UniProtKB/Swiss-Prot annotation:
Gene3D superfamilies: Ribonuclease Inhibitor. Residues 456-467 have a biased composition (Acidic residues). The gene is Dnaaf11. The keyword 4Fe-4S does not apply. Keywords: Cell projection, Cilium, Coiled coil, Cytoplasm, Flagellum, Leucine-rich repeat, Repeat. The lineage of its organism: Eukaryota, Metazoa, Chordata, Craniata, Vertebrata. This is Dynein axonemal assembly factor 11.
Length: 473
């Protein structure tokens, strides 16, 4: 059964940014609430309050709601109108389909001078003779009763016959009170019988529906061992019989005729709640546990797993002789939730308990590996040096001999060299060479070119160089 809690009110106050002290409208319908409480202390500014389709049996703890204008208590278990004198601005009251049999309790609403609309249809008092005339005369401020407007002539006629109508209402109330007392006794007797039957079932069988004895044997005999394989079959049969009994009990409950009383409503709700709990318990039993993720098979094979569903890239850096793993970890995730385990043949990363595992093509050195995380993107970069050292051609002494032999081979068989060559010949590029587009030497003006100077001959001492005379070609 539900209760009014602060969390419940706050969840239904999303339209007010979950602020409850300034709340003006609140809807708590279909919450299986049995008692009105805390609302008058937490939400004093309420103007509209919806409490229909609950199990409220008494109007209480609403006297401090001075600003309340509309109160909806339809489809509840209310038997008397009371404790509404403090709701000074109450304009509309809905008590449709309740169990109000004391029609004289409407006199408590005479203090609510602003009350204009009242709904009492579906209550036992609405079947009383003279019901409408009594309410119209008792509540002079009413304008509408059960959705029908009260005219002035109707009120005058009801006022003329008020004495006889009031006496008639009192007699019908007494008869109803006697009938209700019998109904309560009958409901109490049925409840005690059901409790006794349940206690007998629990005492006759175990907590799980099986029979038990106090006889214990230290070592079972051979015949008993032969009977053990048949135990699951008997358990399954007992389970099936229990399910069939539950189905029969459920059908019997719904087909059983019952009176429309607050006790019958409570009984129906308890039965539905019991069924719901049994269904939840059965679903939990049937729910299978998730099998553990297999990372390494029994024969030692490492599997590739990406349960975290992260993007990644694996690169083989031949220049630095290492393998680089770039894992796209969530940007705002805390680094403490990441665990990295580098092994010679695989790398494993646990991201929030979910494994990411990759098998490596070559062995790496775990002790020299490093893991770094980017502060901007959040990516995790794992560098794993390979076990084998990088081999370079310039570090060995017999390189010259080999180069000569290879050069001679290349000269003898140039076609073979051309076929086996991995790199593209630079002379066969289809793109033009940008560096040779402008040829400075060819287009340089002649006057800028350096002119050769004729040095005077040492043989002719009288030679004088005239710069105006052009040189002989």
């Amino acid at each position: 059964m539900g209760r009014i809690t602060e969390d419940l009110i706050r969840r239904n106050a999303e339209h007010n940014d979950c602020v409850i002290f300034s709340l003006e409208e609140l809807s708590l319908h279909q919450q299986e609430i049995e008692r009105l409480e805390h609302i008058d202390k937490w939400c004093r500014d309420l103007k509209i309050l919806y409490l229909q389709n609950n199990l409220i049996g008494k109007i209480e703890n609403v006297s401090k709601l001075k600003k309340l204008e509309y109160l909806n208590l339809a489809l509840n278990n209310i038997e008397r109108i009371e404790n509404l004198e403090g709701c000074e601005w109450l304009t509309k009251l809905d008590l449709t389909v309740n169990f109000i049999g004391e029609l004289s309790s409407v006199k408590t609403l005479t203090h609510n001078i602003h009350l204009k609309e009242l709904f009492l249809m579906g209550n036992p008092c609405a079947d009383f003779d003279g019901y409408r005339q009594f309410v119209v005369v008792t509540l002079q401020q009413l304008k509408w009763l059960d959705g029908k407007e009260i005219e002035r002539s109707e009120r005058i006629q009801a006022l003329q016959n008020y004495t006889s109508v009031e006496q008639q209402i009192r007699e019908q109330e007494k008869a109803y009170c006697l009938r209700r007392a019998k109904e309560k006794e009958e409901a109490q007797r049925k409840l005690e019988e059901e409790n006794e039957s349940e206690d007998k079932k629990k005492s006759s069988t175990g907590f799980d529906g099986h029979w038990y004895t106090d006889i214990h044997t230290a070592c079972p005999s051979a015949t008993e061992n032969q009977d053990y394989p048949q135990v699951p079959e008997t358990q399954e049969e007992q389970h099936n019989t229990k399910e069939s009994d539950d189905i029969e009990d459920d059908l019997a409950f719904w087909n059983k005729p019952s009176l429309f009383t607050p006790e019958s409503r409570l009984e129906t709700l308890r039965h539905m709640e019991k069924q719901r709990k049994a269904q939840d318990k059965l679903s939990e039993k049937k729910k299978k546990a998730k099998p553990p993720r297999t990372l390494i098979t029994e024969d030692g094979k490492v599997l590739n797993v990406n349960e975290a569903k992260l993007d990644f890239s694996l690169k083989d850096d031949e220049k630095h002789n290492q393998i680089i793993l770039d894992l796209a970890v969530y940007r705002y995730m805390d680094t403490s939730l990441i665990e990295v385990d580098v092994q010679p043949t695989y790398v494993r990363v646990m991201v929030k308990g979910k494994p990411f595992q990759l098998a490596l093509s070559t062995e790496v050195q775990p002790d020299r590996s490093s893991a770094k995380r980017s502060q901007t993107t959040g990516h995790l970069l794992i560098c794993m040096p390979k076990v084998g050292e990088m081999i370079t051609g310039g570090q060995r002494t017999p390189t010259s001999v080999k180069t000569t032999s290879t050069s001679s081979r290349e000269q003898t068989n140039p076609r073979k060299k051309q076929i086996e060559r991995l790199e593209v010949d630079p002379s066969k590029h289809s793109c033009p060479d940008v560096s040779t587009i402008v040829q400075e030497k060819r287009h340089r003006p002649k006057r800028m070119e350096s002119q050769p100077r004729d040095e005077p001959s040492e043989e002719d001492p009288d030679f004088e160089d005239n710069p105006e005379v052009p040189p002989l070609i």
